[in-house]
UniProtKB/Swiss-Prot annotation:
The keyword Ribonucleoprotein applies. It comes from the Viruses. This is Coat protein. It comes from Plantago asiatica mosaic potexvirus. Its main location: virion. Required for genome encapsidation. Forms ribonucleoprotein complexes along with TGB1 helicase and viral RNA. The lineage of its organism: Viruses, Riboviria, Orthornavirae, Kitrinoviricota, Alsuviricetes. One of its GO terms (molecular function) is structural molecule activity. The keyword Nucleus does not apply. Belongs to the potexvirus capsid protein family. Keywords: Capsid protein, Helical capsid protein, Ribonucleoprotein, Virion. It is found in: Virion. InterPro entries: Pltvir_coat.
């Protein structure tokens, strides 16, 4: 069929259009992580429980590249930091956690255990369930779907609270970023930023 020809209804129905997203790991990346965890010593029949132990820790502590995870995994001789290290060889920690967001959301809701870092993210108590940084995975159709779907759909207020917190973090990061091309103290004079502290205002809500 020529590229300038529209497909027939039957031809279109026969085509596969799988959902994909650059915000979650690909099947190939998950296979690579599986291989890495197996090499680390994670039992093949416990791969998912180890993955979810990591996601659960990030649900509370965050999934940025700077997060420090402590404590053991379900295998006492393997730490959560080691599992995170395997993941980060292939993809970002946040993308990995985002893939399992719906699973950990259901599990923590069932136990009434909201994310521990919601107050640190400046999220109000009534929106505390929005206080984890891969929350958007709940609305990503490419993320792993639990049997029966989400036990509770995020409310519009929770979505807004999480997006506001995410935007605030981005503005704070940009405010503290140095635009110097060198890290030499001859240029930086030991300062972490080359600009004076200043108030950063979020843009007005769009109509």
């Amino acid at each position: 069929m020529a590229l300038n020809t529209a497909p027939t209804a039957d031809a279109l129905a026969a085509m596969a259009f799988p959902v994909s997203s650059p915000s979650v790991p690909t099947a190939q990346e998950l296979d690579t992580i599986t291989s890495g965890l197996t090499t680390l010593g994670v039992p093949t029949d416990s791969l998912l429980s180890h993955a979810l132990a990591l996601v659960n820790a990030c649900f509370d502590a965050g999934s940025s590249s700077f997060v420090t995870l402590s404590g053991p995994s379900p295998t006492p001789t393997i730490s959560l930091a080691q599992i995170a290290g395997v993941v980060k060889v292939t993809t970002t920690l946040r993308k990995f956690c985002r893939f399992y967001a719906k699973i950990i959301w259901n599990a923590r809701l069932a136990r009434n255990l909201p994310p521990a870092g919601f107050a640190r993210a400046n999220i109000k108590f009534e929106h505390r369930w929005a206080g984890f940084d891969f929350f958007d995975g709940l609305l990503n159709p490419a993320a792993l779907e639990p049997p029966g779907g989400l036990s509770r759909t995020p409310t519009p207020d929770e979505v807004t609270a999480n997006e506001t917190a995410r935007s605030l973090n981005l503005f704070e990061a940009r405010a503290s970023y140095s635009n110097l091309a060198s890290t030499s103290t001859q240029f930086t004079r030991g300062q972490l930023s080359n600009t004076a502290p200043q108030v950063q205002f979020l843009p007005a809500p769009s109509d």
